[in-house]
């Protein structure tokens, strides 16, 4: 930080910069509190979502194993090919205290039996159940993915905000306080010297009676 002029205007400038830096630190702390509150809500949601995903995947795997045993892998593979599809995803961005956080949305993924590319009668009950459970798992996964992206972005922003707060409180503000003290001390010393010179001048040049 460059030194300010050792003048009263310089002192006023440094004090103004210190006030701005202090206000900035307070605003950043308020921002961090809001982001942290949002983050903790998301942590709870993500943990719940992961538990739901574990359950959904467990059901899907069990259903697939049963379908393989009852209908055979080759038959399931032949049904899976026409059932394949691209899933259109919509990514939107919302802002929390100016922080862009992505959100992923998709249309309903669980399909009726006649929407999987084959005649419904081609699907046995176990194969249809396996397909449905996997589609349900994908829906849960996409929901969690959106929250995980949001969580990661908030975490990054909280870290960056903390670094900025630390820089202001540990570097900028102490430096400005020190600079203000230096200028104030120099001005006081200058005032004392001026007062001494004035007394000497008056002593040498007394006013005529």
UniProtKB/Swiss-Prot annotation:
One of its GO terms (biological process) is proton motive force-driven plasma membrane ATP synthesis. Pfam families: ATP-synt_D. The keyword ATP-binding does not apply. GO terms for molecular function: ATP binding; proton-transporting ATP synthase activity, rotational mechanism; proton-transporting ATPase activity, rotational mechanism. Keywords: ATP synthesis, Hydrogen ion transport, Ion transport, Transport. The keyword Lyase does not apply. Produces ATP from ADP in the presence of a proton gradient across the membrane. HAMAP family: ATP_synth_D_arch. Belongs to the V-ATPase D subunit family. This is V-type ATP synthase subunit D. It comes from Anaeromyxobacter sp. (strain K).
């Amino acid at each position: 930080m460059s030194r300010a002029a050792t003048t009263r205007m310089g002192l006023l400038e440094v004090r103004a910069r210190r006030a701005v830096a202090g206000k900035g630190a307070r605003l950043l702390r308020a921002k961090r509190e809001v982001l942290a509150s949002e983050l903790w809500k998301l942590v709870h949601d993500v943990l719940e979502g992961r538990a739901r995903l574990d359950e959904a995947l467990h059901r899907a795997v069990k259903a697939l194993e049963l379908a393989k045993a009852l209908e055979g892998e080759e038959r399931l593979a032949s049904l899976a090919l026409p059932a394949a599809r691209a899933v259109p995803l919509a990514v939107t961005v919302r802002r929390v205290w100016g922080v862009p956080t992505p959100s992923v949305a998709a249309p309903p993924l669980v399909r009726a039996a006649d929407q999987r590319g084959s005649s419904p009668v081609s699907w046995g009950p176990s194969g249809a159940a396996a397909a449905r459970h996997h589609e349900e798992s994908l829906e849960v996964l996409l929901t969690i993915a959106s929250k995980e992206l949001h969580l990661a972005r908030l975490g990054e922003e909280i870290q960056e905000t903390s670094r900025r707060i630390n820089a202001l409180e540990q570097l900028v503000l102490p430096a400005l306080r020190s600079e203000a003290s230096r200028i104030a001390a120099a001005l006081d010393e200058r005032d004392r010297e001026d007062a001494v010179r004035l007394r000497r001048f008056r002593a040498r040049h007394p006013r005529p009676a």
